[in-house]
Structure formats: C-alpha cells, structure tokens
Amino acid sequence: MKDGEETPSVDGSTSASNREKLGTDLEIGPVDLSDGGKEEKVKDPNLVDWDGPDDPENPLNWTSKRKITATCSIALITFLTPLGSSMFAPGVGQLVKDFNVTSTELSSFVVSVYLLGYCFGPLIIAPLSELYGRQYVYHVCNILYVIWTIACAFAPEIGSLVVFRFFAGLAGSCPLTIGAGSIADMFVQEQRGGAMAAWALGPLIGPVVGPVAGAYLAQAKGWRWSFYVLAMAAGAITISSLFSIRESYAPTLLARKTKKLQKETGNMNLRSALDTGRTPKELFLYSIVRPTKMLFRSPIVFLLSLYVGVIYGYLYLLFTTITSVFQQQYNFSQGAVGLTYLGLGVGSLIGLFLIGATSDRLLNYLAAKNGEKKPEYRLPPMVPGAIFVPISLFMYGWTAYYQTHWIVPIIGTSFLGTGMMITFMCVSTYLVDAFTNYAASVMAANTVFRSLAGALLPLAGPKMYAVLGLGWGNSLLGFIALAFCALPVIFWIYGERIRTSPKFQVTF
C-alpha cells in the first residue's frame, strides 16, 4: 500500500478486504485505455507479489486455526509482560525493609521504572520488526525478558534491581509494540476488532491480575518469588511461541519469496512488490524516525496517544498507592489488599466484553449504511468509555476519603477498568485501521506516550494525596479526564478531514 494515512482505494466496487489481500497489485495504478475508458493494470514481470488474492502464503489468507493459534500466543505474551509490571508492587514494603530504602519516590520508581523500558523499547523494536520481520523480534525479546526477570529475582541491592527492571521492561515491550501489527498482518479490517480485543486483554488485565497474585506470593514466600514465577511462566511461553508464532509481515515474506525465486531462476532483476529500494540502514533509520514523526505530525496520533497515556498513568498511580490506601483507611492485611485490585479486573473484563461484541458489528453496520468503511466507525463506543473514567475517579476518591464501606471504592475502580478497556480498544483499532501499513510504528508511538505517563505519574501520587487528600487529589485527576471526553466526539466529526488534510499527511 502507498504511504499515507488511509488504505488507498481503487474504485468504489472493490471491498476493503480484497484491497488488503491483493496487496500492491492494486497499487501499481490504473492505466486509462482508449477502449471505452476501461482501466487495466500493467504489471512488471520482474515484480514478485502474492499469487493472486487467495494465495495461502499471504497471512490474510491463513486458516482460522493458524491465525487463532498465533493470536493466542501473542496475547499470552502480551498478558505476561504487563503482569510483570505490577506483580511486584505489593512486595515493595518487604523490599524497602530488606534494602533499607527510606525514599518513597524510590520505592515507587522501582515499580514504575519497568514502564520506562516500555518507553524506549518500542523505538527500537518497531523498526527492527519492519526491517527483519516480526517472528525473530518476538523470539529474541522473549528470551531477553526471561534473562532479565531472573536477574531481578537475584538482585543484590536496590540499584541493580532498578536497572534489571528497566531492561526487563525494554524486552517486555515487544508484544505491546508489534502485537497490533501482527493482527493487522493476519486480519482484514472487518475481522480485526475481535482479534484486537483478545490482544488488548493483556496490557489491561495483566497489570490488574499481577498485584492479586503478587500480594499472596509476597506474604507467603517473599517479594523475590514474584520474579521466580514470572521467569518460569515466561520461559514456558517462550518455548511454546517458537512453534506457534510464524512470520506474518508481508514485506518480509515477499522479500524471502524474491530471494528464493532469484536463486531458483537466476534472474537477479526480480524484486519484491513491497521493496522500497532503500538499503537496510536507510530502512532502519526511516523506521526509527517514523513513530516520532507520526506522533508529532498527526494530531490524531498525538492527542489519542496523550489521552491513553493519561488513563494508563492513572492506572499505575492506583497500582502504587492502592495498597497504602486500603491498609491505612480500612486496615487490610498485605494478602487481602491484593484483592482490592479485582475491581479494576472485573471492570476491564466488562469493557472487553462490551467492545469485543460491538466493534466489528458497528463497523459493518455503519459501512453498510454509508457505503464505505472508515476508521472513524471505531470511535462511537469511546464516548461512554471516556465518561466512565472521571466517574470512577470521583467515586473512588471521595468514598475512600470518607471511609465508606470498602466495596464502594472498589466498585469505583471498576468503572476505570471498563472505561480504560473501551478507550484503549477504540484508540488501538482506530489507529491500526487508519495507519494499517505502519501499524507497528503507530502503536510504538502510542506505547511510548502511554508508558511514559505510567512511569512518571505514579511518582507524583504520594505527594499529591498528602497535599490534596484522597478526595480532591482524585477529583483533580477526574477533572482532567473529563476534559478529554470531547476527543472521541471531535474525531468522529472531524477525524476524516484531519486524516486527509495535506497539512497533516505523514509521508516517509
């Protein structure tokens, strides 16, 4: 497909799924002939492309079993690495005593530094995946994740633990960075919503489940056991993924096909239909610049990434403070406090069910009604999802402040889980649909913003609550979230105009 923000169209009668399956055959361009104005494509005989729209080697045409197996493997990895971001949080109190840490900022940072790895990882991983393909990047990052997690388990002091956590986050950012790209490789637009829902479960449910398991592990075995369990689980998933994850990136597959045909035929003039003509060094540099360029040249990418970053920051602020809130306000034990995270988990599952059941159906309904598929058709569910976020913060903050029954603030956090899941899913599918060719890059830009907020915002949490209290502290966050509620409406109305405006075109 050509560079740009929309999937290029050929004519009004060609479906989006057929355009994606045909690949560059549809992009060579129509030639106007004299016989009645009919159009015919002229194909270079040295151009190596898919063997027609139904080529089984094209990941869009893989069997359902193969797609589901790959998606489940990617979803498992995407669940595990965010799980590692928060599983350690309930054991921080033990670590503080073991390492004689007196700084509250440092005790928060040892949790959130993992997300700094999420910030820098995508800037390297996304270009590598678009240069060398998805498969090898997954495998290398999975192995590195296991190594750094084991290092965390044996960290001798706080400084080394911070460093090891950073590198674990760096490697662990892989599935969050290129997972959406893998799904875009395998699923056409009208099937993408359900697959994206399965993949998105990890980054949102993983951090919620982590503290529940981590609290009981820390109480029973000590804080290091969080890392032992993570390393064992990651090792098992890494081994299974060696067999279940196959290369799905079309440019890489066509490049391999081209090399094979060159060897078989001796025709060195053969070239991939998706070959840009750039050297690997040029491609890598372009790919590194691409996420940053998309982030700062496209208002859509910037504002939606900022919004998701704010919500993700709120999530991790809760992770680093909810333990002290329920221990101080409600006298919960270390084990019991882990259960307070279940409100976020239940809310996220509700949000996942709602968006998974409606995203593709709504897209197809609006497309049938209006005669074409638009990325903006992913946005309507985001309106109620955005409203749930400030409701959650107001409810959680004031009920915890006045020490109402403990179930009420937990119910309040469930609204954050629901709103967060719906918002994250709508934003992810919208960006992937709008930037399908560069799905990994646009999600890298989104992940960087999201992770930066998740790493830094929790550092301000303890002082904010100390100055403003639980009520007004969370209300401040709620008012900020309330201001962002206008975004889905703005992009529903003006999104297409912004995407297609020459002023905001992102070219490479």
Swiss-Prot record:
GO CC aspect terms: peroxisomal membrane
What is the reported phenotype of gene knockout?
A: Leads to a decrease in benzylpenicillin production.
Q: Which CDD domains match?
A: MFS_Tpo1_MDR_like
User: So which domain of life are we looking at?
Assistant: Eukaryota
Which residues carry a glycan?
N61, N100, N331
**Location of the region described as Disordered in the Swiss-Prot/TrEMBL record:** 1-60
Q: Which cysteines are joined by disulfide bonds?
A: none
Q: A single Pfam family, by name?
A: MFS_1
Q: Where in the cell is it found?
A: Peroxisome membrane
> What keywords are annotated for this sequence in UniProt?
Glycoprotein, Membrane, Peroxisome, Transmembrane, Transmembrane helix, Transport
> Which residue windows are transmembrane per the record?
73-93, 108-128, 143-163, 166-186, 197-217, 225-245, 299-319, 335-355, 379-399, 407-427, 435-457, 475-495
Q: Where is the composition biased (Basic and acidic residues)?
A: 35-46
Query: A Gene Ontology MF term for this entry?
Result: transmembrane transporter activity
Q: Coiled coil where?
A: none
Q: Which InterPro entries match?
A: MFS, MFS_dom, MFS_trans_sf
The record places the motif (Peroxisomal targeting signal) at: 293-307
**What membrane topology term does the record carry?**
Multi-pass membrane protein
Comment, domains: The peroxisomal targeting signal allows recruitment to the peroxisomal membrane by pex19.
Q: What does this protein do?
A: MFS-type transporter involved in penicillin production, most likely through the translocation of isopenicillin N from the cytosol to the peroxisomal lumen across the peroxisomal membrane.
Question: What family does this belong to?
Answer: Belongs to the major facilitator superfamily.
Q: What is this protein called?
A: MFS-type transporter penM
Q: Which organism is it from?
A: Penicillium rubens (strain ATCC 28089 / DSM 1075 / NRRL 1951 / Wisconsin 54-1255) (Penicillium chrysogenum)
Q: What is the lineage of its organism?
A: Eukaryota, Fungi, Dikarya, Ascomycota, Pezizomycotina
Q: Which gene codes for it?
A: penM
